[in-house]
Structure formats: structure tokens, C-alpha cells
Swiss-Prot record:
ATP binds at G38, P39, N40, G41, A42, G43, K44, T45. Its EC number is 7.6.2.5. This is Cytochrome c biogenesis ATP-binding export protein CcmA 2. Belongs to the ABC transporter superfamily. CcmA exporter (TC 3.A.1.107) family. One of its GO terms (molecular function) is ATP binding. Keywords: ATP-binding, Cell inner membrane, Cell membrane, Cytochrome c-type biogenesis, Membrane, Nucleotide-binding, Plasmid, Translocase, Transport. Coiled coil: none annotated. It catalyses: heme b(in) + ATP + H2O = heme b(out) + ADP + phosphate + H(+). It comes from Cupriavidus metallidurans (strain ATCC 43123 / DSM 2839 / NBRC 102507 / CH34) (Ralstonia metallidurans).
Amino acid sequence: MADAVLEARELGVRRGHCAIFRGLGISLAPGDLLQVMGPNGAGKTSLLRVLSSLMPPAEGDLYWRGRAVRAGDPDYLAQVAYLGHVNGIYPDLSAFENLQFAARMAGQQPDADAMHHALARFGLDRVADAPARTLSQGQRRRVALSRLALTPRALWLLDEPLTSLDDASTDCFHTLLAEHLQRGGIAVVATHQRLPAEGAVLDLATDAGSP
């Protein structure tokens, strides 16, 4: 068994004065997928934000390759691709320009061929030059997911990635995720819908400690 790369020990998250969960442990090695499930309010999004280091836990510690991670840790963030409920695309930029901007923000030289290929995989080649504000919610989600193929990050943290996707785009996402895991990447996916990929399932309603 490969050594753990991402570890969470005795994690606890609070909302105001109320504990959402506590005592949570996670240990993930290269190629691992963790599906996080649970009803609304169970803390799925909060857990992803803690794992992204965007929010400190109320309790416990997070480790990456054996080193403690603190909120906003730049070295850790360079390994993370985080996709939340909000797609994070700019409405006045085209789909293609959004990918260009994301590449530059990641410190990469934009590769036009790779960007066109990423958009085409999600069926966006015909709207690549259209302003994002003219796209449907499903198309905007697909633009956001296209970024994952362009910025190689070891850890994917995805919050309901299948939202607004049609069947073809859902299949494309499953393929993209499988490729990431086969390369030794790690993924933590909050979802209401079980993914077909092999991996552990964490149900925050039953598997995480509560007050």
C-alpha cells in the first residue's frame, strides 16, 4: 500500500457555536478517491474548504506529505485544484479566455492547442469564443471543469462537480477523473450522487463524530 500523502487527524468543524462534525480522520495515498456524502448541512462544503486550507478547522490538523498545513499555505495551495459551487469564471471573458486567464494565474504559459482540446472534450468547441455570460449554467460548469485538464495539480477538491451536467458531460467528467487517479492524483469529491469510480465513501451523517 502506498504511503498516505493527505492526512486529516481529529478534524472538527463548527458553524457559529454549533459543531457540525468532529474527530474526523482521513488518509489518502496517490490514486485514491474519497467521495463525501451526506444531507445538506452535514458539512461537505465546509470539509472541502478545510482540506483546501481556505478555512482553518475548529479542531484537529491537516498534513500534506507529512508536513502540517496551515490556512493559506502557498506551497500546499500550489498542489490543489478546488472547484466549489461557484464556477469561478468571468462572464465578460470567452470560454477560451477564461482558460487562458486560469493558466496565467497558475503561473503557466497558456497552450492554445491544449485549451481548445480541453473545451472540445466537454463539447464546448463551438462556443469557445462566446462570452461566458451567454452560456447556459451547464456550459459554464463545463468550462470550469475544463480547467482541471490544463492545470496539473496533485489534489482535486470538487464540490458537486456533476451539477447542471448532461449525460455526455457527466461521462466526460468520469473519464477526466479516472485519468487523474491513474496518474497518481488524489480526489475528494462532495456529491449527492455516487460516482462509478472505485474509492472510499465518507458519509458525514453517519461516519463523522457529532457533538
